[in-house]
Amino acid sequence: MGNCLDSSAKVDNSNHSPHANSASSGSKVSSKTSRSTGPSGLSTTSYSTDSSFGPLPTLRTEGEILSSPNLKAFTFNELKNATKNFRQDNLLGEGGFGCVFKGWIDQTSLTASRPGSGIVVAVKQLKPEGFQGHKEWLTEVNYLGQLSHPNLVLLVGYCAEGENRLLVYEFMPKGSLENHLFRRGAQPLTWAIRMKVAVGAAKGLTFLHEAKSQVIYRDFKAANILLDADFNAKLSDFGLAKAGPTGDNTHVSTKVIGTHGYAAPEYVATGRLTAKSDVYSFGVVLLELISGRRAMDNSNGGNEYSLVDWATPYLGDKRKLFRIMDTKLGGQYPQKGAFTAANLALQCLNPDAKLRPKMSEVLVTLEQLESVAKPGTKHTQMESPRFHHSSVMQKSPVRYSHDRPLLHMTPGASPLPSYTQSPRVR
């Protein structure tokens, strides 16, 4: 696909282990993982409780990455057969990177099977001229070919035949969080489901951040959070992932790349990347879950507003919090839990990166919120008044500052892309 890297090219990623401390149990898991067959028929991972593990190779050649024993190398014809020649009626979504199709493979051999039989998968086909180039494609294969966790999307295999670049993932029937929050006609998510999704996403980020060789996700957003049939959240699209700082380094200096509205301000301004950059992005998504609004909103007469700038004045005020709560919740949420979630978002969005909590700390709070939000749990409902979307935006017209050093923006991508793509900062 265009100017591809040759087989000896290196991928810029440092050591990273697929094992982290569990924020809920406090126990470590080891790098001794084994793949087993889950309910869907696809390979999942079981973990040993051995606390000893070592780092993965710092740099790997393309040949080493593509020879991962955890991934199947598909031929282009196999994926053509699996998707019925990429027929439009199998199209799941489309974005700047290309298209995603539903496909079927045999559970045992992983070869193409008849539509409706075998295992359903999502096949992402990159456009040669798309925004997600070979380097990002290879980075995703590199990370997901080694990392395995219940809250990371499972990469089944890939195709690198000629200029064709495809990725084969487990199928996520509920699609992206972005669709559920913002797509017209979507069934509103209950408060309990929103907290469940937040917990799952937080577990995925905690796993990446607390691995022995840290991984910074760098593109955390609603479009990259995919949901299975039970609304369990899994992180997808690792094309922008970056190895965390090593040794005495406190940050990684890198080209500014991410998504407009989600990227941490200090990263946009300086290119200094830390795990706290991901924490900021998580705060934005948590704010989207609370408010039902996009990170960047241009619905008010075409003027673009930052959700963070607009909502921040209300997050720490119990009496005014109802003004930013998603009206689609119909007032059905615990007042105390909503205020705790709002305060947590405020902490994640602290302009001073050092004062933001760790993802493991965020996870502890979210798990407490999830436990009291489960159906059947008694809590105080907070009735929010009915008001029109645009009138709320006018209550606090903090306009997004366009003098920030933002770079070129392109659409983001995920195995099951959203109907409307979030702009990516480059």
Swiss-Prot record:
SUPFAM superfamilies: Protein kinase-like (PK-like) (SSF56112). Disruption phenotype: No visible phenotype under normal growth conditions. Increased sensitivity to the pathogenic biotrophic bacteria Xanthomonas campestris pv. campestris (Xcc) in vascular tissues. GO terms for molecular function: ATP binding; protein serine kinase activity; protein serine/threonine kinase activity; Tat protein binding. It is a lipid-anchor. The modification O-UMP-serine is found at residue 253. Changing residue 262 to A: Normal cell death induction in response to the Xanthomonas campestris effector XopAC/AvrAC in the presence of RKS1 and RPP13L4/ZAR1. InterPro entries: Kinase-like_dom_sf (IPR011009), Plant_Ser_Thr_Prot_Kinase (IPR050823), Prot_kinase_dom (IPR000719), Protein_kinase_ATP_BS (IPR017441), Ser-Thr/Tyr_kinase_cat_dom (IPR001245), Ser/Thr_kinase_AS (IPR008271). Residues 39-52, 417-426 have a biased composition (Polar residues). ATP binds at residues 92-100, 124. Strongly expressed in leaves, moderately in roots, and barely in flowers, mostly in pedicels. Residues 14-38 have a biased composition (Low complexity). Its main location: membrane. CDD domains: STKc_IRAK. The modification O-UMP-threonine is found at residue 254. It catalyses: L-seryl-[protein] + ATP = O-phospho-L-seryl-[protein] + ADP + H(+); L-threonyl-[protein] + ATP = O-phospho-L-threonyl-[protein] + ADP + H(+). The modification Phosphoserine is found at residue 253. Its EC number is 2.7.11.1. The modification Phosphothreonine is found at residues 75, 254, 259. The active site is at 219 (proton acceptor). Residues 86-369 form the Protein kinase domain. PANTHER family: OS01G0588500 PROTEIN-RELATED. Involved in disease resistance signaling. Contributes to pathogen-associated molecular pattern (PAMP)-triggered immunity (PTI) signaling and defense responses downstream of FLS2. Acts as a BIK1 decoy and enables Xanthomonas campestris AvrAC/XopAC detection; X.campestris effector AvrAC/XopAC-mediated uridylylation promotes the formation of a complex with RKS1 and RPP13L4/ZAR1 which, in turn, activates effector-triggered immunity (ETI) against X.campestris. Promotes, when uridylylated by AvrAC/XopAC, the release of ADP from the inactive RKS1-ZAR1 complex, thus activating the resistosome. Interacts with FLS2. Interacts with the Xanthomonas campestris effector XopAC/AvrAC; the recognition of X.campestris effector XopAC/AvrAC requires the presence of RKS1 and RPP13L4/ZAR1. Component of a stable high-order oligomeric complex made of RKS1 and RPP13L4/ZAR1 which recruits X.campestris effector XopAC/AvrAC-mediated uridylylated PBL2 in the presence of ATP to form a wheel-like pentameric resistosome; this complex triggers immunity toward X.campestris in vascular tissues. Binds to RKS1 when uridylylated. This is Probable serine/threonine-protein kinase PBL2. It comes from Arabidopsis thaliana (Mouse-ear cress). The lineage of its organism: Eukaryota, Viridiplantae, Streptophyta, Embryophyta, Tracheophyta.
